[in-house]
Amino acid sequence: MADVRKLKNYINGEWVESRADKYEDVINPATGEVLCQVPISTRAELDQAAVIAEQAFEKWSQVAVPRRARVLFSFQQLLIQHKEKLARLITLENGKNLSEARGEVQRGIENVEFAAGAPTLMMGDSLASIATDVEAANYRYPVGVVGGIAPFNFPMMVPCWMFPMAIALGNSFILKPSERTPLLMEKLVELFSEAGLPKGVFNVVYGAHDVVNGILENEIIKAVSFVGSKPVGEYVYKTGSANLKRVQALTGAKNHTIVLNDADLEDTVTNVISAAFGSAGERCMACAVVTVEEGIADEFLAALRTAAQNVKIGNGLDDGVFLGPVIREENQKRTIAYIEKGLEEGAKLTVDGRETGLSEGHFVGPTILEDVTTDMTIWKDEIFAPVLSVIRVKNLQEAVRVANQSEFANGACIFTNNAKAIRYFREKIDAGMLGVNLGVPAPMAFFPFSGWKSSFYGTLHANGKDSVDFYTHKKVVTARYSLKGYEE
């Protein structure tokens, strides 16, 4: 272990050795190899970063918006140039296959591209005449220092929801990446600095509870963006709000896919396999439950089982691999425990992913549990793994009722060619992001990532116009300019 590199925090434009007493191993989940060690930084280090970020904000917020946008454009171009390197880093520390990693990098680039439109996004509103000789204008201003807490499952895309937009709009930023996937952030920091970002505007502090609490409690930090599990998200929202911060917390999910009798069988199976088992099911837009109409159920499920059994499992860097590992051994054990809990509660295991035949790494194969009911733990809980529950239903109305019983409401999908059914689904389903004949309805950067119910805590979502509102506050100026003396 003496040769394992210890990562440093990034504060005021410099890589600074942490004062942490504890470091955690960063592991390649496909091989078990220790890639590096990440510091579990102290509260004092977070507080130091906050002071630096506040000082940087005073200057950065005064930089002309088009000039800030040019830094973002330069950053975007550098990301494009290093796309393959970034993708390989994601696969190395996260485990998802290289194709998925490339897709994630592209999504991150698109978020930076959207943020580079800051001159348009920052525009306010005005009305030339609200009364005699009186006009009003609405101006946007950055809120100040912003904190971000990011998860392991999308180490590029999710942070790129946060810091590029916040910084483009004139804020400074402190990011706590996941301690499980910190390597990618090193490269992003390097490229952002190369793009011309001034020192102190973007800071990275690795860590765990102390750093999270620092972000939530430090008075300098005015807003917090979080993506992660429901229990932590609830804590972040309650604690941050109690400290008078703006908070957006994107949390858990249990996404339902509805398959109706008229669905295109081959296309639907392909989409469900990708949505349920892509990224090892470790994404908040994964398909967790399929509700399938009785008329197509037997044929659909037979094809789905066959497709799941033919999925290639292995190291995401290897050619042809579709399903990589889950992030850690404890996640693997937790997933297997959920599968066995499903069996205890009466579900039927038709594709068993507990044994993959791989001697190293933390793998769970595609798993399908049928005859699931809404009182089962596997239906209620977010498993966050390649485990798919199946419920047979009589019709669309029943499928919607099943989905709406979940405490989560991130996304939902329907496969059908019936326009009336699509309209009914759109109007009646309780979910913020809907897909029609596609499996993962994650919106582009210019639309909000709009989970409902226990999938989101806050008012303003990530991405889209919501993100502009979240990272800015407004001043309305009402002015009287008498035209007396200019009469014709």
UniProtKB/Swiss-Prot annotation:
Its EC number is 1.2.1.27. One of its GO terms (molecular function) is methylmalonate-semialdehyde dehydrogenase (acylating, NAD) activity. Keywords: NAD, Oxidoreductase. Gene3D superfamilies: Aldehyde Dehydrogenase, Chain A, domain 1 (3.40.605.10), Aldehyde Dehydrogenase, Chain A, domain 2 (3.40.309.10). Pathway: Polyol metabolism; myo-inositol degradation into acetyl-CoA; acetyl-CoA from myo-inositol: step 7/7. PANTHER family: MALONATE-SEMIALDEHYDE DEHYDROGENASE. This is Malonate-semialdehyde dehydrogenase. It comes from Listeria monocytogenes serotype 4b (strain F2365).
